[in-house]
Amino acid sequence: MTARRAPAVNRDVLEQMLVEGTAALDLTLTDAQRNQLLDYVALLGKWNAVYNLTAIRDPKQMLIQHILDSLSIVPHLRGRTSARVLDVGSGGGLPGIVLAIVEPGWQVTLNDIVQKKSAFQTQMRAELKLVNLSVVTGRVESLQPGVEVPEKFDMIVSRAFADLSDFVKLARHLVAPGGSIWAMKGVHPDDEIARLPEGSHVKQTIRLAVPMLDAERHLFEVAVDDAN
């Protein structure tokens, strides 16, 4: 039995979708940034069979469900010309690679426990020439500032890592003073919020509108007392 091939899609079609999507999000990208994002989609599709990065194989759906979904959080994270960002459970590099492309002033670190996914992330750093991107393999709860990572982070993000309460428990020791944990979720996770550990609380809840995606999406900013 042969693997099902992804449908071929003209790059111009994807570029037009990206232009329309970023306009809907009120984001302005340079030509170079658009090309990097389109190259990333192509590379994600090319290496997906080897690294098992995503169940989505249609390039159009990759653009919508991965790129535009990741871009939808950018307006809410902006406000810093420089920031240290950790993407936990990054997998194929989402949202971290997208953040590194559109915010070159940020230092973005991708984290995953699976070595082959870290290998793909490292390859993307080289192919997309992302000098502001780094990769660290290992369990987030085992990462120590000054050892596995240089220092604590202003923003710790996750797109599909874990239950919100578990995410906070595992990553809170890496939040810099004044920093926050940012979790991307689908439907509003009332039960997960109710189980947030002591010394943490939801600072803001944002209903995301992802262009061309008819699905409920939320972004949660969680503050932790440890970071004060």
UniProtKB/Swiss-Prot annotation:
This is Ribosomal RNA small subunit methyltransferase G. Its EC number is 2.1.1.170. GO terms for molecular function: rRNA (guanine-N7-)-methyltransferase activity. S-adenosyl-L-methionine binds at residues 89, 94, 140-141, 159. Specifically methylates the N7 position of guanine in position 527 of 16S rRNA. Keywords: Cytoplasm, Methyltransferase, rRNA processing, S-adenosyl-L-methionine, Transferase. It is found in: Cytoplasm. Belongs to the methyltransferase superfamily. RNA methyltransferase RsmG family. Its main location: cytoplasm. One of its GO terms (cellular component) is cytosol. PANTHER family: S-ADENOSYL-L-METHIONINE-DEPENDENT METHYLTRANSFERASES SUPERFAMILY PROTEIN. Pfam families: GidB (PF02527). It is an enzyme of class 2 (transferase). Signal peptide: none annotated. It catalyses: guanosine(527) in 16S rRNA + S-adenosyl-L-methionine = N(7)-methylguanosine(527) in 16S rRNA + S-adenosyl-L-homocysteine.
